[in-house]
Amino acid sequence: PIYPARGLIRLEDGTVIAENIVTQGLYIKSKLFKTSRDQIEKLYNQVLDESRTFDQQKLQIKDEEKIWLVKNLSEKELARYEVQKNTIPSIKLEAKLKRYLPHRNLFSHVIGHLGLISSNERLTLSRAEYPSDSYIGKVGLEKSSEKLLKGTAGISLLEVDVYGNKVREIQRTTPDKPSNITLTLDFKLQKIAQEELANRRGAVVALDPMTGFIKVLVSSPDYNPNILNGSENGLSVLQTSMEEAPFFNRAISGLYPPASTIKPFIGLLGLEEKIINETTIVEDKGFFQLSEEGRKYRGWKEDGHGKVNLNKAIVESSDVYFYELASKLTIDRISSFLLEFGFGEISGIDLTNESKSILPTRNWKLGNIGEAWFVGDTINIGIGQGYIS
């Protein structure tokens, strides 16, 4: 098979954020593997860096004629191989294209990474298109756009001699070129968001308010996809600390309370239901009570905001105003209203592993918590807390 180079991923200004580079690898033909142990030992002792370890079980691929010993030689390793290659004739050098992100971690949670194809994946895919040493999209755009980015393999039919050496090419079918993808992300804004997060846990998503196009999507901590793509050497995934979950895309997979961002929606619903108007005044003393003896729902500002109307309540983010408003609404009406704005749904972004948000109802709480819905639950929803996420 002749495999086309994987499609490029660019930004609208032409900046390439995912491309392909040539790397040098070493392989041995499967039929020579058992009889060439001395050559393999010499390779690891005299050519490869000390960090390389030989794992026969990992290398043994029974259904392919090649066994890859190393897939990404450093310049020093390549130089040592050139010196020693006549003493290890069974081990051959071959150039391969590898996926490469020139900006490494910056777009890791958008682009994602490739990985060695699994046995389960091979069951549903063409073996001609995906031999056992293939790299395939595992997450992010690399996975969701795998078919677009991969293209279709061509074929080169060769005549070989008794030793397997090429004599001539009999027939060639040109591979179909893959598609390139252009993203709406803004490089400078993406970089600023990454730097401000400084590898602390968090996420930043920014949309163009006029078009809805995503300009920033950053999740932190992040990781270097090139190590998993095989285009750079580095610590394996197993050696990477998992405590901070660098592979978890907090921007689309994490579920968090919407908090005060929900207040304009609750205010709009209050206007629609004619419970309030733009001049309705609420006395914010720093807490709200349904009754004199009832629980106090405290606002973020201890001494309150004083007399507030809807505009001031949104500008100063008065919790008490929205506690009181939510207490006059029902969870049924709140849920149905928020559903119209996409709450409780997935956005449909063309990335993998997006989590569906939680928009609670009476039945949801009964089924998931095993309890009835209380007015206090509705009050918490009014400021984007409680069961909503």
Predicted segments, located by residue:
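Beta-lactam-recognizing serine transpeptidase/beta-lactamase-like catalytic domain environment
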Residues: 18, 160-169, 209-260, 265-389
